[in-house]
């Protein structure tokens, strides 16, 4: 029998009832717990780092060709820090919401808290609806992007099938994520995912340096404002992967320890993205403008094929990360979220995969779609809405006085915190959504005009006779 140990944890004003499971004493039980049941700080770090870097690792050199080397590096650092800030803000709001609810004796043991519920509990139904719309739409297209990336990558190993056919195949494969109950169960997958992207990043870096600069290579970026802001918005998308922050926090045994995890994960991710993007851009320059997937320019070797296979597995994992919150929303809508039957939940989840599959076939534009999603959805989902929600939540003096998490002292208290939130909201609204949205939509429409909807093989080289 599995016994439960309920522990009261007090951290400042934070009171939480934790539930820790004692696994079976058998070898099988211990192995299952080791690989399957994750809730530690390390699990959260692996989840954040693994989920953040994903397929954008392959499109960042493309962004560098649009931005130029200096702007590419600066935007990565800038948006990395900004993303870490809003992830921190989301974590503060989660802790505030959960603390208030647990003081009311609400039990979350069979219920996964999500971002729209945090907004609902703190600010009301209008904020809930806003958060639900942007979060679900972003995660929907985030899943679409992973599916497109699978087809784009496998094509560089096996081009006997076109990318659309590969999308059909991988759509069926990714549908198996319906059997993964929650973020608790991504322990081994998150770890392996980060190992895979680490290998791929350093392969790209070393292979580009060994290849040397291509003949007559040019580094003319930035040349057009449209390309410049498209590239910048892809980087905004890169460091805006924290639409699943609340679900990752909820999977932790001690969610209040999350505060700095995303920043530390981002710093590690930068050790992968900066060298790889810079090296590939140095080697291939403007050629990347027509090759949004960096792997398409690197010579085919066993190392490259290994990178492709590892990224395919990682994209399957990231598909699960993006889709699992959608599964939760759908379960709650149908009233089966708290059922203990895994098979019943899996069957209920299957319809969620169908629109993702369909959209990946309509818009197979690997690279350009990242920027479009970044400007129109990520800008609000993980930057603007969290910053505004935090300011409104703590607008009154009593709310600030009773806040569970106080502002860091080095910021200068509430004034400093509000100043940062205002800057983030205004910057992302003007540069990310405004200029980025304009540029990304122009580029996206250009891809549709060039390749058409339902493109059979986006950016595929002509087949040799």
Swiss-Prot record:
MF annotations from Gene Ontology:
symporter activity
Topology feature Extracellular, residues: 71-72, 151-165, 211-225, 281-307, 371-374, 443-465
Record GO biological process: amino acid transport; auxin-activated signaling pathway
**What is the annotated localization of this protein?**
Cell membrane
> Could you confirm whether the keyword Transmembrane appears in this record?
yes
- Which residue ranges are assigned to the Cytoplasmic compartment in the record's topology? 1-52, 94-129, 187-189, 247-259, 329-349, 396-421
- Record's InterPro entries? AA_transpt_TM (IPR013057)
Keywords assigned by UniProt, alphabetized: Amino-acid transport, Auxin signaling pathway, Cell membrane, Membrane, Symport, Transmembrane, Transmembrane helix, Transport
- Which organs or tissues contain this protein? Shoots and roots of nodulating plants. Low levels in roots, nodules, stems, petioles, leaves, shoot apices and flowers.
Q: Which Pfam family, just one, is annotated for this protein?
A: Aa_trans
Q: Which residues cross the membrane?
A: 53-70, 73-93, 130-150, 166-186, 190-210, 226-246, 260-280, 308-328, 350-370, 375-395, 422-442
Kindly report the protein's main subcellular placement as a broad class: membrane
Q: GO CC annotation: what is one?
A: plasma membrane
Instruction: Please give, as recorded in its UniProt entry, the membrane topology of this protein.
Output: Multi-pass membrane protein
What biological function has been recorded for the protein in this entry?
Carrier protein involved in proton-driven auxin influx. Mediates the formation of auxin gradient from developing leaves (site of auxin biosynthesis) to tips by contributing to the loading of auxin in vascular tissues and facilitating acropetal (base to tip) auxin transport within inner tissues of the root apex, and basipetal (tip to base) auxin transport within outer tissues of the root apex. May be involved in lateral roots and nodules formation.
The record's similarity note reads: Belongs to the amino acid/polyamine transporter 2 family. Amino acid/auxin permease (AAAP) (TC 2.A.18.1) subfamily.
Q: What is this protein called?
A: Auxin transporter-like protein 3
Q: Which organism is it from?
A: Medicago truncatula
Gene name of the encoded protein? LAX3
């Amino acid at each position: 029998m599995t016994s439960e140990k309920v522990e009261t944890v007090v951290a400042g004003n934070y009171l939480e009832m934790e539930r820790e499971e004692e696994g079976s004493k058998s070898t099988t039980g211990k192995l299952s717990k080791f690989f399957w049941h994750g809730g530690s700080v390390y699990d959260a770090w692996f989840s954040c780092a693994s989920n953040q870097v994903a397929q954008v690792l392959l499109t960042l050199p493309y962004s560098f060709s649009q931005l130029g080397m200096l702007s590419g590096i600066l935007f990565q650092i800038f948006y990395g820090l900004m993303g870490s800030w809003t992830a921190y803000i989301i974590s503060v709001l989660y802790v505030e919401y959960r603390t208030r609810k647990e003081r009311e004796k609400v039990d979350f043991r069979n219920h996964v808290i999500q971002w729209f519920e945090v907004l609902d509990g703190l600010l009301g139904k209008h904020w809930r609806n806003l958060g639900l719309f942007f979060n679900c739409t972003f995660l929907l297209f985030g899943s679409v992007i992973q599916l497109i990336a699978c087809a784009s990558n496998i094509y560089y190993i096996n081009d006997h099938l076109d990318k659309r056919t590969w999308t059909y195949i991988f759509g069926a494969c990714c549908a198996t994520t319906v059997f993964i109950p929650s973020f608790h169960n991504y322990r081994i997958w998150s770890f392996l995912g980060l190992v895979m992207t680490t290998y791929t990043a350093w392969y790209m870096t070393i292979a580009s340096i060994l290849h040397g600069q291509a003949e007559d290579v040019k580094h003319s970026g930035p040349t057009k404002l449209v390309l410049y802001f498209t590239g910048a918005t892809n980087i905004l998308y890169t460091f805006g992967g924290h639409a699943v922050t609340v679900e990752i926090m909820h999977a932790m045994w001690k969610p209040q320890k999350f505060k700095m995890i995303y920043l530390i994960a981002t710093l590690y991710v930068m050790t992968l993205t900066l060298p790889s993007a810079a090296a590939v851009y140095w080697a291939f320059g403007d050629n990347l403008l027509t090759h949004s997937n960096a792997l398409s320019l690197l010579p085919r070797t066993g190392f490259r094929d290994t990178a492709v296979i590892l990224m395919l597995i990682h994209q399957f994992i990231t598909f699960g990360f993006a889709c699992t919150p959608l599964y939760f929303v759908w379960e709650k809508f149908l009233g089966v979220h708290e059922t203990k039957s895994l098979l019943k939940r899996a069957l209920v989840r299957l319809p969620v995969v169908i629109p993702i599959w369909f959209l990946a076939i309509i818009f197979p534009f690997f690279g350009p779609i990242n920027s479009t999603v970044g400007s129109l959805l990520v800008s609000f989902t993980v930057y603007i809405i969290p910053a505004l929600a935090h300011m409104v939540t703590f607008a009154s003096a009593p709310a600030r006085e009773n806040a569970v998490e106080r502002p860091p002292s080095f910021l200068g208290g509430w004034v400093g915190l509000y100043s940062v939130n205002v800057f983030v909201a205004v910057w992302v609204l003007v540069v990310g959504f405004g200029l980025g949205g304009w540029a990304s939509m122009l580029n996206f429409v250009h891809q549709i005009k060039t390749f058409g909807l339902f493109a059979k093989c986006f950016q595929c080289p002509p087949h040799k006779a």
